[in-house]
């Protein structure tokens, strides 16, 4: 019996990998100007232009229960076991909703196997858990081995990023422990990371340039101690800056490094101009 993986839209996995490994994606939504939009249906550039044209800070919401149930049922009806990997339970109610959906599907298909993992993060730090798990599943690995691989990636990965401005962190609301620190660091540029499922501060510096230098040095330090499993540069509407950072990593590590835009659900909390990197080691 094959293992199929379901994730959510905040993994920001490149489309070609979603198609290659047959990954199912359920979409979170954003609400702006009293209108709700599924993240997967949004054009990033247009959304951030819309966000900049209003004083309202958009909010985000978890995938609908119906979409969760439909995705799980489709996988089960195809004769698969189902592994769900979702955004940190401390950042969204998606993980909790998935358990409700699971119980409803199991009422209809009591012999099905559905497992749900808290990625404890978002963006491609979560995406790597999903992609590596999907690779294992496609190679014919059993559910327990796929889960072990996902957990291994989770434990050997990191996401470092720096916002262009603190405005969205101050107003956004869902940034974990970082929110308690913002008031005292208004003159500081924070390098953010995710630890124990929450956004927190990795280091505080004075300029974005210095922040990027520190991020590069940390990534190189980690990736020279161990073999690199994967690395991707994330950006929010600053593609040229993202490509420049990716080229820098390629030069230093001698491996291909792609770039991937972060969508609105995470972007509303850090804002346009944010840049960072997600990576894992073997």
Language-model regions: role of each:
Residues 3-4, 11-18, 23-24, 29, ...:
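Mixed-charge interfacial surface used for oligomerization/domain docking
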Residues 4-62:
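N-terminal glycine-rich anion-binding loop in soluble enzyme alpha/beta folds
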Residues 43, 76, 97-100:
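Glycine-rich loop at the start of a catalytic domain that most often binds anionic cofactors/ligands
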Residues 61-71:
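Glycine-rich, highly charged phosphate/nucleotide-binding loops
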Residues 70-82, 219-228:
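Glycine-rich phosphate/diphosphate-binding loops that line cofactor/substrate pockets in enzymes
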Residues 84, 105:
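Glycine/small-residue-rich loop that forms an oxyanion/phosphate-binding "nest" at active or ligand-binding sites
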Residues 87-91:
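Short glycine-rich anion-binding loops that position phosphate/pyrophosphate groups of nucleotides
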């Amino acid at each position: 019996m094959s293992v199929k993986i379901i994730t959510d839209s905040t993994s920001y996995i490149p489309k070609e990998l979603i198609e290659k490994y047959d990954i199912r994606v359920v979409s979170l939504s954003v609400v702006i100007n009293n209108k709700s939009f599924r993240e997967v249906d949004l054009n990033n550039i247009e959304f951030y232009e819309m966000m900049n044209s209003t004083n309202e800070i958009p909010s985000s919401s978890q995938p609908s229960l119906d979409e969760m149930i439909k995705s799980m049922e489709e996988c089960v009806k195809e004769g698969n076991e189902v592994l769900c990997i979702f955004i940190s339970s401390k950042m969204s109610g998606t993980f909790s909703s998935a358990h409700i959906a699971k119980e409803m599907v199991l009422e209809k298909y009591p012999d099905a196997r559905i497992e749900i993992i808290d990625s404890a993060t978002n963006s491609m730090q979560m995406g790597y858990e999903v992609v590596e798990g999907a690779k294992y599943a496609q190679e014919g690995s059993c559910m327990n081995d796929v889960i072990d691989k996902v957990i291994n990636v989770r434990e050997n990965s990191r996401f470092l990023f720096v916002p262009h401005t603190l405005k969205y962190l101050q107003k956004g609301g869902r940034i974990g422990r970082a929110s308690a620190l913002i008031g005292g660091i208004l003159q500081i540029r924070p390098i953010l990371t995710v630890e124990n499922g929450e956004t927190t501060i990795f280091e505080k510096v004075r300029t974005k340039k210095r922040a990027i230098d520190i991020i590069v040095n940390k990534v190189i330090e980690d990736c020279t101690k161990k073999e690199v499993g994967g690395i991707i540069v994330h950006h929010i509407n600053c593609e040229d800056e993202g490509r420049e950072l990716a080229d820098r990593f390629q030069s230093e590590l001698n491996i291909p490094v792609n770039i991937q835009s972060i969508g609105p659900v995470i972007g509303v909390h850090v804002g346009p101009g944010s840049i960072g990197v997600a990576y894992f080691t073997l």
